[in-house]
């Protein structure tokens, strides 16, 4: 029996886990966003 690939893409899970609203929910998530803003990232989150 072959092992399943670990990456099974789903846009819903992508947004829920890494989206902007998900980042804003936690203090650490907001830290991530502020770091990415400071770095000058064009895209802040998924």
Swiss-Prot record:
One of its GO terms (cellular component) is ribonucleoprotein complex. The keyword Ribosomal protein applies. Residues 1-11 have a biased composition (Polar residues). InterPro entries: Ribosomal_bL34, Ribosomal_bL34_CS. Belongs to the bacterial ribosomal protein bL34 family. NCBIfam families: rpmH_bact (TIGR01030). This is Large ribosomal subunit protein bL34. It comes from Stenotrophomonas maltophilia (strain K279a). The gene is rpmH.
